[in-house]
Structures are given as C-alpha cells and as structure tokens.
C-alpha cells in the first residue's frame, strides 16, 4: 500500500446521524458547534467539535448540508449524548432534530479524484462516500485503515478522544475550529487557550521498529529515565516497511525531546520510538 497517495475503499459502520431542519437550523447549530455552519460548502462535509460549557469534548462530528437540512454525524456509541446535548438549548428556536438513517451499505472511497458525491475526510485523506460497492479498487483491511489514520494523525473516540479532551490537546483546532465565528458553547475555553494559554499535553506521532502488544497500556518515557512522559493511544505496524506508527499524548515538559522508550505497566521496555511530524511515514 502506498501511504503517500493510497487509493482504495472501506465500508463505513458504527456512525450515528441526525437531521436538523427548520428556519433557525443554521443559526442554532452555529451556537452549538466549533465551526461556522454558514460557511459549509454544498457537497462537502466538515469536522466539528461538540463541546461542554467548559470546553471539553462531547463528541467529534462531521456536518454537511443536505437540501434545506443539516446532517450531523458522530460515533454511534455517542448517539444519545449527541442528541441530548443538541436538544438541551432548543428553547424558542424553530428547529427540529430527528434521527437520520445511514445508508446501508455505505462505502468510503479514498481518492484524489473529484468527488462525485459527498466529499468527506474520514482518515485524514481526500475521499467521498458512496452507496455502491466500488469496482476496480482494493478494499482496505482494518489494519490498513488504522495505519492510514494513525499516519495522518486522525484521533478517534475511545482512543485519542474522551470526554476529558480539550480540542487543542488532540490538534483539532486547525480543521474543526473556526476562531473567527460567533459565540458557541465552550468557546470561551477554546479561545482562551489559543490567546493566552497552552494545554498540558498534546497529541504527537511516533515511529519505531518494534511491534507493540495490543490491548495493554503503553507509556512514553525519556531514554534511561523512569519518568512518565506520556502515553501511547494507538499503534499499527507496517510489515512492508517493518516499522510501527503510533499516536500518543506527550506531556508539555517533554515536548523538546525527540526519542522515547516505550514501557508497559511493569516498567519493562518494549522498544524505542522517535517523535515525528504528520504524516509519520
């Protein structure tokens, strides 16, 4: 697989969708999420953050226009959370939030060609969704999807993203935050971090040669130093290149370092990694 310009497809699953409609839909949603809804381009989805009043993440979203409605998509395990959070501030607004069925099956094609349907970035690469199974393109395995996602630094819920995550910690501010838009829930914290503060940890990419075990906590530490510098959240091994790409949070005081050991909960060193810019490979 060519990680620089991969072309292929995978089936999209485990997504929750809602339709927001009504005369006040754009204005209302603009006050709830981190992007400027009025700037949405037809036929193109944008990532957004749904936040708490304290600026922490409720859910990572994809939002796009569909006719006169707005479609809101997020992780299926957050379906009830998304619905409750979006309905909480509907008072005198002329809007209606409804569950929206995801087409089944739904496929996502990673391609640099112009999108004939909804253009959406699902793993850090240009692509589009289609209901017809592609012909003549390779289907990505789960391992390849994970490697592509990690290589591009795309965080997902349950790994890099939790209810305690601030957008800037996960590097969501560039694609999923419009700092020049009007007020929205959680904006005060996000804007303050941009102007006068720094987060205590931040998502980084790492590259090493050792295969790492799945399903166990993995910690970053300076070489020869038992201090915990951070934690690995996702990793995938590229067998063709004999290298492991990983995502993890690095505590701010260790961001000047480039090389780290990977250790398990017992302190046993499992390998070494180098901090890398995205794309990692």
Where in the sequence are the language-model features?
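Short, conserved active-site entrance elements at the starts or edges of catalytic domains
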Residues: 148-172
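Glycine-rich, small/acidic residue-mixed loop/short-helix segments
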Residues: 61, 165, 171-177, 185-187, ...
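Short amphipathic beta-strand starts and helix->beta connectors
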Residues: 1-5, 48-60, 91, 112-118, ...
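Short, conserved charged micro-motifs
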Residues: 24-29, 79-83, 113-115, 132-137, ...
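Short, surface-exposed ligand-recognition loops at beta-strand->loop->(often short) alpha-helix junctions
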Residues: 19-25, 38, 111, 207-214
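Acidic, proline/glycine-enriched N-terminal capping motif
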Residues: 1-58, 67
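A common structural junction motif
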Residues: 36-37, 86-95, 136-144, 224-228, ...
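Acidic, low-complexity central loop/insert segments
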Residues: 8-19, 59-156
